[in-house]
């Protein structure tokens, strides 16, 4: 069994991580650290776990008992945590924050998008789990970048559920504001653009266009729906060939019909659809922001790092209705 530790275990993504790991056939939670909830049952915080476990949160960090550590702290806090709490070299780390996603001297974290970095993840000691928007958008764009056919500016619109903002209450996550409402935020400046641009230029270094990304807050709890628009001279057949890279993928599927959120919510699945309209190309992609956009993808990365079946613990069914 893979012995697991979790830090920052009280958030939404951590709750999904716990849910997945409790049902994982080859992993066992050793500790789940949450200073503000030490001694409380998992189900006191993650109420959907009621009846599933009598495990309790702890304020301890017994690193010597684990094989892998999931860090589920807020952005900018992971690096500080690791400086103050050195983790033994033999313990693998999967970080949920953006602290290690951007390549830099001394940063040995592999970017954890399995569809493009599987072989590197398999050999990695440390993995930076991609952001939720970044995952959904890259799955729409990277097949074109890998084929070297992205040209000109790319317009991206993506709408996310309220869980993407985290568990701490904010004015823009309050039910009476969010319900029946939509809004934009961080227009053209969202932090996930850094990792998206990094990946595109990794596969297509000569791409010179802009990524014009407008994020939206949706009036639903979970999921991301992305549309990507660009001009192209490619035929539909050539476009389909680019996305054939997803053939055989355990979770990401290229489909020939329109897609919707309910097909992926509560799963680690990603769906991508690309359709040509004259000289215009529209690519749509959908994921669950808490699973393929966070906890599910983190477990997928763990599975790859330990050489077990990539879908272990992740055979989840969409709600559908």
For each of these PLM feature ranges, what is it?
Residues 189-255:
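C-terminal substrate-binding/catalytic lobe of Rossmann-fold NAD(P)-dependent dehydrogenases
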Residues 1-180, 185-187, 205-206, 273-277, ...:
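N-terminal Rossmann-like NAD(P) cofactor-binding subdomain of oxidoreductases
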Residues 229-321:
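C-terminal active-site/capping subdomain that shapes the small-molecule cofactor and substrate pocket
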Residues 184-188, 216-218, 260-264:
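Short Gly/Pro-enriched turn/cap motifs at secondary-structure boundaries
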Residues 18, 138-145, 193-197, 240, ...:
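Predominant activation on well-ordered alpha-helical scaffold segments within soluble catalytic domains
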Residues 124, 182, 223-227, 280-282:
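Short, solvent-exposed beta-strand edge segments and adjacent coil->beta transition regions
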């Amino acid at each position: 069994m893979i012995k697991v530790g979790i830090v920052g275990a009280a958030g939404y993504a951590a709750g999904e991580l716990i849910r997945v790991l409790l049902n994982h056939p080859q992993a066992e939670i050793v500790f789940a650290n949450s200073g503000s909830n030490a001694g409380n049952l998992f189900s006191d915080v993650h109420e959907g776990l009621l009846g599933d476990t009598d495990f309790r949160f702890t304020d301890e960090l017994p690193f010597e008992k684990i094989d892998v550590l999931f860090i589920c702290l807020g952005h900018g806090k992971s690096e500080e945590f690791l400086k103050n709490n050195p983790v033994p070299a033999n313990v693998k780390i999967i970080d949920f924050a953006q602290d290690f996603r951007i390549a830099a001297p001394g940063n040995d974290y592999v970017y954890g998008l399995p569809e493009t970095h599987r072989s590197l993840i398999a050999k990695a000691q440390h993995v930076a789990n991609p952001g939720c928007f970044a995952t959904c958008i890259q799955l729409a764009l990277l097949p074109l970048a890998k084929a070297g056919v992205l040209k000109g500016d790319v317009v991206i619109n993506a709408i996310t559920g309220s869980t993407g903002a985290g568990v701490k209450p904010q004015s823009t996550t309050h039910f009476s504001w969010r319900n029946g409402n939509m809004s934009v935020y961080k227009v053209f400046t969202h932090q996930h653009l850094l990792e998206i641009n990094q990946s595109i230029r990794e596969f297509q270094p000569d791409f010179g266009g802009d990524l014009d990304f407008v994020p939206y807050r949706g009036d639903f709890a979970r999921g991301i729906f992305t549309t990507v628009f660009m001009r192209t001279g490619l035929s539909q057949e050539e476009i389909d060939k680019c996305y054939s890279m997803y053939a055989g993928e355990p979770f990401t599927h290229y489909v020939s019909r329109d897609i919707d959120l309910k097909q992926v919510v509560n799963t680690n699945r990603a769906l991508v659809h690309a359709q040509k309209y004259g000289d215009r190309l529209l690519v749509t992609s959908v994921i669950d922001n808490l699973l393929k956009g966070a906890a599910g993808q983190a477990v997928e990365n763990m599975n790859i790092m330990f050489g077990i079946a990539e879908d272990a613990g992740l055979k989840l069914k969409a709600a559908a209705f």
